[in-house]
UniProtKB/Swiss-Prot annotation:
Tissues of expression: Expressed by the venom gland.
Superkingdom in the source lineage: Eukaryota
Biological role: Mast cell degranulating peptide with moderate activity. Has hemolytic activity. Its mast cell degranulation activity may be related to the activation of G-protein coupled receptors in mast cells as well as interaction with other proteins located in cell endosomal membranes in the mast cells.
Protein name: Parapolybia-mastoparan
Modified residues (Isoleucine amide): I14
One CC-aspect GO term: membrane
Pfam families in the record: Mastoparan
Coiled coil regions in record: none
Alphabetized GO MF terms: toxin activity
């Protein structure tokens, strides 16, 4: 699991 990628995706979703 990539935290950096997850954070970027979450920020884009919001």
């Amino acid at each position: 699991i990539n935290w950096k990628k997850m954070a970027a995706t979450a920020l884009k979703m919001i």
